[in-house]
């Protein structure tokens, strides 16, 4: 179980990217929204 916590925490060298890593899982949702807006713009052809 401790290995899971070790893997969940970024190494110290990458701590500056910690806020970025928190945002990364949301990116596919933006692509889904973009696809919907694109289809709405072309009239769902």
UniProtKB/Swiss-Prot annotation:
Residues 1-8 form a propeptide. One of its GO terms (cellular component) is plasma membrane-derived thylakoid membrane. Its main location: membrane. It is found in: Cellular thylakoid membrane. It holds the Pfam family PsbK. The chain crosses the membrane at residues 24-44. Keywords: Membrane, Photosynthesis, Photosystem II, Reaction center, Thylakoid, Transmembrane, Transmembrane helix. It is a single-pass membrane protein. GO terms for biological process: photosynthesis. InterPro entries: PSII_PsbK, PSII_PsbK_sf. It comes from the Bacteria. Belongs to the PsbK family. HAMAP family: PSII_PsbK (MF_00441). One of the components of the core complex of photosystem II (PSII). PSII is a light-driven water:plastoquinone oxidoreductase that uses light energy to abstract electrons from H(2)O, generating O(2) and a proton gradient subsequently used for ATP formation. It consists of a core antenna complex that captures photons, and an electron transfer chain that converts photonic excitation into a charge separation. PSII is composed of 1 copy each of membrane proteins PsbA, PsbB, PsbC, PsbD, PsbE, PsbF, PsbH, PsbI, PsbJ, PsbK, PsbL, PsbM, PsbT, PsbX, PsbY, PsbZ, Psb30/Ycf12, peripheral proteins PsbO, CyanoQ (PsbQ), PsbU, PsbV and a large number of cofactors. It forms dimeric complexes. This is Photosystem II reaction center protein K. It comes from Crocosphaera subtropica (strain ATCC 51142 / BH68). The gene is psbK.
């Amino acid at each position: 179980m401790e290995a899971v916590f070790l893997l969940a925490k970024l190494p110290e060298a990458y701590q500056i990217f910690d806020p970025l890593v928190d945002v990364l899982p949301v990116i596919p949702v933006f692509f889904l929204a973009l696809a919907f807006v694109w289809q709405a713009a072309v009239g769902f052809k």
